[in-house]
């Protein structure tokens, strides 16, 4: 309300959902209020239903796919694919292309790819022996999205596109991530976090009503210890470092 009263541009918001409850009424509300909606969906039916069953332990892929196909005719929806050990086990030379073609067929045009971290189901976490296959998946994924840029209606990966734009603009950044710098997250309990990955780890930015208390986030982002990255030419272009992982396990120097 204060933004509209002062002719201030409304901020953008984002939510991540499994998509089960999305409909045109909700999407219309989100569209009018600058809320970007991202749907968690892990590629094809077999992979998605292996890890994302509904509350009744039933498969969800077909229902979500049907909703997304209808809604993307009128609204922009983003995808979020989370790589987990099921992707490692299912990998073949054609599998990465098949995962993204499945998403594209639903009407998605933009999204990102994450990696599972400290899952409640430890069987889904990646293991050291998975690294070789993970590298192949990353290679195939980058090849896929570069080829997509040459098509009439490409599917974009937000992170790959962001790095390319930084290169084209010669735009280097002091921060590896926007967590707590250009973005914040609010939980359903009203706790304010730098990003969703800080959830359930006792972190609260404690932003007051009259001023920004930023000492906490400064302690996280001002003391990066990614020593192995010091001599890398791409350190100010890279967006792979995660402040949340650092906060959760500083001694392991995870990045």
In which residue ranges do the predicted regions lie?
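Canonical radical SAM enzyme core domain
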Residues: 1-50, 54-63, 81-98
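Radical SAM enzyme [4Fe-4S]-AdoMet core and its adjacent flexible, acidic
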Residues: 46-179, 183-185, 203
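C-terminal accessory region of radical SAM enzymes
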Residues: 133-167, 192-240
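Cys/His-rich zinc-coordinating "finger/knuckle" motifs
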Residues: 184, 202, 236-239, 245, ...
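Short, acidic, Ser/Thr-enriched surface-loop or helix-capping motifs
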Residues: 187-189
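Short microdomains enriched in Cys/His and/or Lys/Arg
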Residues: 249-255
């Amino acid at each position: 309300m204060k933004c509209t009263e002062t002719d201030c541009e409304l901020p953008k918001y984002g939510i991540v959902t499994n998509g089960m409850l999305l409909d045109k009424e909700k999407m219309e509300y989100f569209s009018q209020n600058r809320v970007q909606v991202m749907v968690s969906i892990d590629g094809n039916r077999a992979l998605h239903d292996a890890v994302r069953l509904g509350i009744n332990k039933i498969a969800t892929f077909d229902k979500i796919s049907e909703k997304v196909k209808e809604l993307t005719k009128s609204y922009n929806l983003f995808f979020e694919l989370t790589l987990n050990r099921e992707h490692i086990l299912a990998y073949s030379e054609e599998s990465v292309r098949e995962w993204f073609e499945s998403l594209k067929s639903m009407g998605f045009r933009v999204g990102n790819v994450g990696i599972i971290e400290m899952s409640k189901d430890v069987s889904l976490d990646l293991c050291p022996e998975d690294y070789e296959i993970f590298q192949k998946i990353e290679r195939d994924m980058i090849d896929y999205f570069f080829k997509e840029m040459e098509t009439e209606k490409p599917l974009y990966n937000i992170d790959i596109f962001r790095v390319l734009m930084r290169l084209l603009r010669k735009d280097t950044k002091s921060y590896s991530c926007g967590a707590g710098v250009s973005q914040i997250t609010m939980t359903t309990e009203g706790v304010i976090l730098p990003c969703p990955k800080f959830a359930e780890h006792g972190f609260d930015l404690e932003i007051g009503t009259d001023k920004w208390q930023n000492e906490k986030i400064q302690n996280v982002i001002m003391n990066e210890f990614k020593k192995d990255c010091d001599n890398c030419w791409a350190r100010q272009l890279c967006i792979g470092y995660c402040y949340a992982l650092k906060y959760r396990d500083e001694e392991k120097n995870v990045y």
